[in-house]
């Protein structure tokens, strides 16, 4: 059975001060899919999420969420978002905050369902939400996002500030939500969170959608070679057509190539030996996350 398209975008662009923040992006997301948005800082991930949520307007193109414009008020309880910032009140205890949010929704998670997500003890529930650790606040914010039983959730860098054990717990919850048919769109700086959780990957770079693929397909793509060399060999390669993403550092430079044999022939002719260079394999997925970490 083919699932219904729950989000559709057609040629959407967003321009600010004559600069494209998003440029001519089109994709669909089906009901129940788990989709990862990846790309370097400044690629447009958060802006795209905000446009899908109706929090920011697009300059051109069209977005539909459940066949409605993202600003339609009937989507209020249908969609929710975990933003990058943990916005928790200063003076409410965890238990008080949960009760407050439950009262917003006619149909909401009960206390036992929330306990199953948080696994907080009585002392933690009696603590001011603002006094929790960063990872606990993040998990609490996530639970608050789910209280109204949304059908679509957006998670913007969801595990930021979490320790390893909390992060593992978080993705256990996400996988259960996937199995229950929730549609999930998230961004991440962790490669393992994309490989093990996402059904699809949307790769953004400088506001453009450069790839719509799956973790398996992306891993199977052609492998590039990542070279690191001393600066003395820069003149040999700096204008070579098979060298790209060249970056010069204090005492070395690095680059990517799909023609390592040709590059090695040139380097040998210039007196380079194996001890002078370092070579690593990189798929596109590796390259995206390496760029993200550097930024």
Predicted regions mapped to residue ranges:
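Conserved ABC ATPase signature
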Residues: 128-132
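Short, charged/small-residue-rich alpha-helical element at the C-terminal edge
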Residues: 224-295
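The feature captures the beta-strand-to-loop junction immediately N-terminal to the Walker
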Residues: 38-40
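Catalytic Walker B motif of ABC-type/P-loop ATPase nucleotide-binding domains
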Residues: 153-157
